[in-house]
Regions:
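Short solvent-exposed loop/turn micro-motifs enriched in small/polar/acidic residues
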Residues: 2, 83-85, 179
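Structural signature of FAD isoalloxazine-binding scaffolds in flavoprotein oxidoreductases
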Residues: 10-27, 73-103, 116-121
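Anion-binding (especially nucleotide phosphate/pyrophosphate-binding) glycine-rich loop
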Residues: 1-68, 72
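A gly/ser-rich beta-alpha-beta helix-loop segment of oxidoreductase catalytic cores
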Residues: 57-88, 154
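Basic, gly/Ser/Thr/Pro-rich low-complexity segments located predominantly at protein N termini
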Residues: 9-11, 45, 68-75, 82, ...
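Residues embedded in well-ordered beta-strands within globular domains across many folds
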Residues: 29, 59, 91, 228-229
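Phosphate/pyrophosphate- and phosphate-bearing ligand-binding catalytic cores of soluble enzymes
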Residues: 9, 93-232
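Short, well-ordered alpha-helical segments in soluble proteins
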Residues: 50, 68, 72-76, 91-94, ...
Length: 232
């Protein structure tokens, strides 16, 4: 299984799956209004390239500790923007050959992108701006994250939105803030995030997620779908 930065993965204490890192594919090149990035390029690196070249459009990535390949696969997003909004095409390895997939031919949606093969890289289209303006917008997004999201160890949002409503709202209303199993605990700051406050195991996290989803179902009749990926 190919993995990027692992920021949305919950890894088993005894995984049976072999992980293949894409970190070597970290090329980032700007060409006019476009930037090509390898699957292993950190979003922060792409953002620095965009800022340097006065290109705006991916400031919403600020604070997301992911690689480009992972962001494409999960269609990572924030602040009403998503990665696939900016993608022109992606290059994938399939059947031993490299194939270019243009966005018009890719099936994608909220927090998922279907790809026939392993993502190697891709191009994004941005808008002309200035380095100062891009830098300021990035700072604003970072500040919003600091104000609303916990700073502890987490894998990001555990569950996807439901009908445009953040799962954290349901978890909060279900009284789950502070609920824990072992070292895994629901954040007091934002119930959509589960924290590892020291020594949390894979089973701690899974039990907490299952418990939380069950409570929301019982109270609201709402079925939560995981945004994190279990790696077993």
């Amino acid at each position: 299984m190919p993995v990027g930065g692992g920021s949305n993965l919950i890894v088993s204490d005894r995984p049976r799956t072999v992980a293949v890192s894409t970190s070597a594919f970290d090329l980032v090149e700007a060409n006019g209004r476009k930037i090509y990035a390898g699957a292993g390029a950190r979003l922060s690196k792409i953002m620095r390239t965009a800022e340097k070249n006065g290109l705006s459009g991916v400031e919403f990535w600020a604070g997301i500790p992911a690689t480009f390949g992972g962001a494409v696969k999960m269609n990572a997003g924030a602040f009403s923007s998503e990665t696939m909004d900016k993608v022109l095409y992606i290059d994938v390895l399939t059947g031993g050959k490299v194939k270019r997939l243009w966005k018009s031919g890719i099936n994608y949606g909220y927090r998922h992108t279907e790809t026939d093969g392993i993502i190697l890289g891709g191009a994004i289209a941005l808008e002309p701006s200035s380095p100062d303006a891009v830098r300021q917008k990035t700072r604003e997004y970072l500040e919003k994250r600091r104000q609303t999201q916990p700073a502890g160890k987490s894998a990001g949002s555990v569950f996807k939105k439901v009908g445009g409503v953040g799962a954290g709202k349901y978890l909060d209303l279900a009284g789950l803030k502070g609920k824990r199993f072992g070292g895994a605990v629901v954040s007091e700051k934002h119930a959509g995030f589960f924290l590892n406050d020291g020594g949390a195991t894979f089973e701690d996290f899974r039990r907490l997620a299952d418990y939380a989803a069950d409570k929301v179902w019982q109270k609201f009749g709402v079925k939560l779908e995981k945004e994190v990926v279990y790696f077993e």
